[in-house]
Amino acid sequence: RGVVPSAVGALRTGIRVLFRTDGVLTVSTLLTFGIVMVMGSFQGLVLPVFFTDSGRPELLGYVLSTMSLGLLASSLAYAAFAPRLSRRTWYVLSMFGMLLGVAILGALPPYPFMLLGALVLGVSAGPASALLGFFMLDRIPEASRGSALGTQNSLLLAAAPVAVFATSVGVSALGTSVAAIVLVGCWMAITAFALVARGMRNLDDAAPDPKREEGALEEARLDS
């Protein structure tokens, strides 16, 4: 079998695993895409343009560093205290906290409040980041993990530049402030989807039976 047919088959299998075998896995994948696209647009375009227009481009580094430190601290805290709350509780708190942080950043406030928004976003993102990563590994059958993760990484690499390009068009046509508000609106939609999605209502349930998943994967391979 040639390289190209094998690659196409792996891509098709990866897509089926990510989007058709398990509700939690599907929602986790879609949320990951949404988060990468919106945050990539904020960090890669909106905030740099805002600080450059303000005449203080060097302040961007402090905002992004604050966000990263908050994410690191909350990830460590989640690892230590995760058993004290249900996964659903951590998930809901994280999504609401991230929405608050994005809303603060999207308002493009004075610098101290910008740092506050970055800190809130970073601290809130830790549990969600850990949970989404866990669901990806826990719900993907081992036999197709390489195909699924490879497909996800490929799609993410394509999604982020597309989102930044679309945001650049918005910034050019509407201005930085309006583009930031649009991104906040997109994040609100992501948060609403994350909270009401059927697959994310019982996050403490066990993963589906691996044998059933392997059967679905075998069917996907035969179809490809």
Regions found by a protein language model. Give the residues of each.
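Juxtamembrane intracellular "pre-TM" segments in multi-pass secondary transporters
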Residues: 1-30, 213-223
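A single, central transmembrane helix in multi-pass transporters
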Residues: 16-75
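Transmembrane alpha-helix termini and helix-breaking/packing motifs in multi-pass membrane transporters
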Residues: 52-54, 162-181
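Substrate-agnostic recognition of the 12-TM MFS/MFS-like secondary transporter fold
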Residues: 67, 75, 79, 117-168
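Helix-to-loop junctions at the C-terminal end of transmembrane segments
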Residues: 74-87, 171-172
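Structural signature of the two symmetry-related core transmembrane helices
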Residues: 89-104, 182-185
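Helix-loop junctions at membrane interfaces in 12-TM secondary transporters
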Residues: 106-118
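Intrinsic disorder in cytosolic terminal tails and internal cytosolic loops
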Residues: 197-224
